[in-house]
Amino acid sequence: KFIESLIVGYEVSSRLGTASRPRKNVHSHGHWGTPGAAVAVAKLSDYSANDMRSIINISTSMSPANSWTPCFEGATIRNAYSGRSGFQGILAVHMYEAGFTGIHDAPSDIFGSILGDAFEPDKAVLGLGDIYRIQQPGP
């Protein structure tokens, strides 16, 4: 069950990343990890697909906005981006349990207009069910 949850979280993160075009000045480490972590926790907790949709919308609204400047200046805060993303994903599930709601289509809003220049939902679901992204070789 843990491995399945991990794979589902990775799949969501990867697919959101594929569908997004981050702004040039935005460091994307952590963006897609927040909903990925949230989905992994939700899957591990046996939430329904409808619950996960709500959790994705909450967690996407919590995705960190990071710039590239710390990388260029050598600031070590950049090392916390991915970990903070995981923490916020876990927090999103607890917030859902406490009754918080997100906007209807947070990925399109957050990744398509705030952290990015475009979000293409069709790319997020292209080939869904054919092969898991974790099985695909890198570039």
Segments from the language model and where they lie:
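A glycine-rich phosphate/pyrophosphate-binding beta-strand-loop-alpha-helix module
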Residues: 1-38
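Functionally critical mobile loop/hinge segments
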Residues: 28, 32-34, 39-139
